[in-house]
């Protein structure tokens, strides 16, 4: 199946060079409907879900709006992911013109035909550039076109397609022993493989140093939380977990880490967070690879049968692009000083609101402890655009590094 898709993508590139974008459209529809019927409707693998995913693309109504030059404004297509059981009588017909059959094949391939293993490791880099792994943990994860907040329970899933999420709901238990200290870094690697384990390739790699995590953590320490702790005579219990989003190399997806301070038995309010809106922090997220022994957990439920989201036209065009194979090679290079501040790290916090922060901000800097302390670094999820996963699977096929 992977070979057939790769060959079709190659033929498409050749056809575009010969006769332009509009050539062989009907031929391509025949190919993708045949692929969908053959590999998902007729062939049922032993571990394959009894579900089919369809990407429906419609034109939204624009009314009488027009552009500055007088032309009629084109409507942004509305994308809807529909989910049906294989034996449902409501399955869309193979000739349905509103179904994007190519994307439907690719989505079902990523969700059902591949296995995924994520590895989180605490490492150090030697002077020669080699990576030394001190401890690591691997966990099987599942691809989903939907997401839900990791800092709250019971919230309904929302559509994320074309971004695919690999979530670890029990991240605090799975990565309970992942602590990072001075001079160390946290490395994340996500690997895809087929059901027979004949194919294996890295689809995400990233790393972040302890110093960057600690800087984020320190900058989120909440003066308001400290004051509330004192004024409530200890009855106020703060939550000291921060969610740090790490961008992948060259913007290739991102991973989220739940960061908290390892308790030392000190009950003082040092180490609480600033719960003000996320302040911009920057850390270069470099690349690399993934997994040893998997631990299976139950596959999560997928979301509602019909999920809608408008996708800009330029995003659709972007999904069709091929991407270079060197997205992950920066992990092997030495950090270049000031360049470490180029990738923004977005933060989310589930701490107390920062009331009075502006009044006592300078006092915070004076009273903050300068010493280093251990941090928990729990991986919560990895997310990647569908087209980047396809490119890594079909073209790049980078070998894992963390897997031994």
Curated annotation (Swiss-Prot):
Reply yes or no: does the keyword Transferase apply: no
Compositionally biased residues, Basic and acidic residues = 320-336
* Residues found modified as Phosphothreonine: 290, 293
InterPro entries in the cross-refs: DUF2045
Compositional bias, Polar residues, is annotated for: 262-278
Region Disordered: start-end pairs: 262-307, 320-340
Protein name from the UniProt record:
Uncharacterized protein KIAA0930 homolog
Name the source organism. Rattus norvegicus (Rat)
